[in-house]
Amino acid sequence: MQRLEESLHEAPIIDKDGYSYLVHPISNGVPMLDPQLLREVVVGITRAADLDVDKIVAPEAMGIHIATALSLQTDVPLVVIRKREYGLDGEVALHQTTGYSESEMFINDIEDGDRVLVVDDLLSTGGTLAAICGALDDIGAEVSDIVVAIRKVGETALDDTDYEATSLVDISVDEDGVEIH
């Protein structure tokens, strides 16, 4: 994960109400995302993840580019958990609470018995992933694996579930920059 680690060290840190916020191509789409960095992340996920799945699941918005590239690499169909309701048959709503927001998200095209791989850009508070896994459980899907590109060290809402996420790199962030763990 040489490119990923180097890019994390180079990423700008901005202060948002006393919170040191990492601005990174994988987690924010800015600065520009180098295709070699995205490729490195996808190769890392293919090595780390259980790919014996029916579908790849990713939350809107910043999980989409990673999951799309992974879907193309593996030929596993992609389901995006969206922030907008369409009212389609079988649509399931979930409520997510993160460290900085609360919102509804919506799942389509997941059925009882589906084996899924959940992919996301960043695990920080864990609120999004915990809500997604709970909703997938309620549907009857089996979450075979959860893989994130970047994990901020510390407690998360995922810790209160039966799920564990694998990360390609673990970091901490403060006003001085990023530390790789």
UniProtKB/Swiss-Prot annotation:
Lineage top rank: taxon: Archaea
Gene Ontology molecular-function annotations: transferase activity
Sorted UniProt keywords: Purine salvage, Transferase
HAMAP family found in the cross-reference section: Hypx_phosphoribosyltr
SUPFAM superfamilies: PRTase-like
UniProt-listed InterPro entries: HGPRTase-like (IPR026597), PRibTrfase_dom (IPR000836), PRTase-like (IPR029057), Pur/Pyrimidine_PRTase (IPR050118)
Enzyme Commission identifier(s): 2.4.2.-
Role according to the record: May catalyze a purine salvage reaction, the substrate is unknown.
GO biological process, one term: purine ribonucleoside salvage
PROSITE patterns from the UniProt entry: PUR_PYR_PR_TRANSFER
Native species: Haloferax volcanii (strain ATCC 29605 / DSM 3757 / JCM 8879 / NBRC 14742 / NCIMB 2012 / VKM B-1768 / DS2)
Similarity-based family: Belongs to the purine/pyrimidine phosphoribosyltransferase family. Archaeal HPRT subfamily.
The keyword Membrane is annotated on this UniProt entry: no
Protein name per Swiss-Prot or TrEMBL: HGPRTase-like protein 2
Keyword Manganese attached: no
Gene3D superfamilies per the UniProt record, alphabetical: 3.40.50.2020
